[in-house]
Amino acid sequence: MALSYIGGKSKIGTWIRNYIPNNIETYVEPFSGMFWVFFKLNTPIFKNLKTVVYNDVNPLNVNLYLCLKDYKKFWEMTQNTPIENKELFNKCKSDLFDTEFVLDMNNPNFDIAIKYAYVLSQVWSGTDPKKGNLILKGGYEGKDGVYKSKFEIFRSKLIDPKWHRYFDAITNIENLDFEEVIKKYDSPTTYFYCDPPYFKTEDYYINHDFGIQTHERLANALKAMEGRFSLSYYHFDLLDKWFPVTEYTWKDKEFAKTAMAVPGKAQTKGTEILIMNY
């Protein structure tokens, strides 16, 4: 998507995808963010998939995805948007984070969605968009040798049939607490990919009041469900108590922490844990 988000799984989504059962009928991400794991799916192999649920507690994320469902209108409205423009970038940030407004989930706001995409696509990967600065030349050079900014790359996906397939597959967009969305969609044929704010990194996220009691509430909701889940975390001691390795499948993978990345310096390594009830 070319949109950066705190804790996003753009780098390891393919690894996670390999553990998702392909006989599911409903796919849900209770903490969808930029929905990277879904975008890594090879959807044609999921023959029984009928329902795809995007859910996030952050109204800015939800509004963005409501607007992306009408990708043609989104693309048309961005045609005159200048790229890597510091003045516009700072204005978008101010309009989003220094100005009070209310988003109506029944009436998507394309102006806000475009400003949000403009900021997310042009901050350093994993940076809090409220605090991030414009990254000049943060895009990529294509095979033709022509440079494209990340906002241009994002915009190009709005007219790409490959991406239309993903946008069209999203059937439900919710702005619910994770426990509500789990209860609403849980069934024996539902799969939940859960990527919550990680333990002791919760303050990086917008609109997340996520203390240890909330982590435990999530654990209890997952353990009580009928469906299948995969849960991403960094390791902390309570995970061993909540999800003992004798009862749950654990996998791990080393990766570069984009949220701690600094231009010009080697990226910090971390170990991603994936816990499954199957």
Report residues per predicted region.
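SAM cofactor-binding core of SAM-dependent methyltransferases
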Residues: 23-98, 143
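Short His-Asn-centered micro-motif
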Residues: 30-31, 55-56, 174-176, 194-196, ...
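Conserved beta-strand scaffold positions in the cores of enzyme catalytic domains, especially
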Residues: 52-54, 172-173, 247-252
